[in-house]
Amino acid sequence: MAANSEPFWKRKTLAQLDRDEWESLCDGCGLCCLQKLEDEDDGAVYYTRIACKLLDLQTCRCSDYANRIKHVPDCIQLTPAQADQFQWLPPTCAYRLVSEGRDLPHWHHLVSGDPDAVHAERISQSGRMLSENSVAEEDWEEHLIFRAG
């Protein structure tokens, strides 16, 4: 009986989550919507502060989530089937944490109850991003913020 009192992310695998549980894991940091560059020599993935054209630069939410694939065909859609590849996600990402059997951080909205905590704790890049429409792709390297992995 005690196991059922555990939050869903502690008692279920990613593959066992229903759609609402899956979507609720997203903390709204927007980091997965930042443009990334891959080092050709070692395969390392680097995040830039260049945001997808659909990402709201303040709220860190997609401005057209339901239709994002139509507007951004290469938009990354995370699924439980990809869990073994989540190492490219930020170390704070709930999808990555749960896939690694780890708990959610204290600021995550499912723990804290505060959807703005991700911004207050400066986990998100809210207010610190640039739209991909404002930076030439050849200049993205000038805007690296961290290495994934």
Curated annotation (Swiss-Prot):
InterPro entries in the cross-refs: Puta_zinc/iron-chelating_dom, UCP006173
NCBIfam families attached to this UniProt entry: PRK05170.1-5, PRK05170.1-6, PRK05170.2-5
HAMAP family: UPF0260
Family the UniProt entry places it in: Belongs to the UPF0260 family.
Protein name: UPF0260 protein Pmen_1776
